[in-house]
A protein has these predicted regions:
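Catalytic alpha-helical scaffold of carbohydrate-active enzymes acting on polysaccharides/glycoconjugates
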Residues: 1-109, 114-155, 171-244
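Compact, Lys/Arg-rich rRNA/RNP-binding cores from ribosome-related proteins
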Residues: 163
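Active-site cores that bind ATP or allylic diphosphates and position pyrophosphate for catalysis
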Residues: 166
């Protein structure tokens, strides 16, 4: 991948259904297989940030992600927010998840649950072998606008929240609004099934129609010259973090 190209980092957070409001794995069981089929159809590869406990409970599905050529990264051992844990417990959560996931594949990428990563843990990520972190977002403090290097870890911000990606007009609007040389999009398998909950940001525009929306969005970015790559690929031309 050349740093001169325009890249779309496509990622999925493989976690229990809409945590902490629901607690099941319907999304993983029913939504994830369709995501893998869609990516095969599009001939693109993505990053799947997997909760460690989910990997233990659904090991066959995680193995299938790897066998189909996608990257797996860590999403913590449970989906508990790291900024609400004691420092050592937070680090152990990351370390435990990486230990589990390395049974399936190499792990160089990380995304914190709820995009909440205390700054002191960035150095710990590097010590644990992580080289790419995607726990920052354009729309949340500190409003990171572009990738940067911190303690040897390349930090790649998320461009837009997943509930916006679910919008019926996302494939028309997002490629016009976000036309940087990099765009980072994430979704969850539970968003591809019909979710019932009182919070609108959880259930609105969820369901099987999201497959077609995602297909249209990816094709819209490809039409603008974007290459779809896993986040872990970002380390290849910039191992020193000096070229971003």
């Amino acid at each position: 991948m050349s740093t001169q190209g325009r890249v779309l980092f496509l990622s999925f957070d493989v976690e229990p259904d809409a945590p902490p409001y629901l607690n099941g794995l319907r999304g993983v069981d029913q939504g994830l297989p369709g995501i893998l089929d869609l990516l095969d159809e599009l001939r693109v590869k993505a990053t799947f940030f997997v909760v460690g406990k989910v990997a233990l409970e659904r090991s066959a599905l995680i193995r299938e992600i790897v066998d189909r050529g996608h990257e797996i990264g860590s999403h913590g051992y449970t989906h508990e927010r790291l900024d609400r844990l004691p420092p050592q417990e937070a680090r152990e959560s990351i370390a435990s998840s990486i230990e589990v996931l390395r049974r399936f594949s190499r792990v160089v990428s990380f995304r914190a649950p709820n995009l909440a990563l205390p700054p002191f843990l960035v150095r710990s990520l590097y010590e644990l072998g992580v080289r790419v972190d995607s726990s920052l977002a354009l729309y949340k403090p500190p409003f990171a606008r572009r990738p940067f290097c911190q303690h040897g870890v390349l930090r790649v911000p998320v461009t837009v929240t997943s509930s916006v990606v679910r919008s019926p007009i996302s494939s028309r609007v997002l490629p016009l609004m976000f036309r940087h040389w990099f765009v980072t999009i994430f979704l969850h398998p539970w968003e591809f099934i019909r979710i019932r909950h009182w919070r609108p940001d959880i259930w609105v525009w969820t369901g099987s129609g999201l497959y077609l929306k995602l297909k249209s969005l990816v094709k819209a970015y490809q039409a603008q010259g974007y290459y779809v790559v896993p986040l872990g690929r970002a380390t290849k031309p910039v191992m020193s973090c000096g070229n971003w």
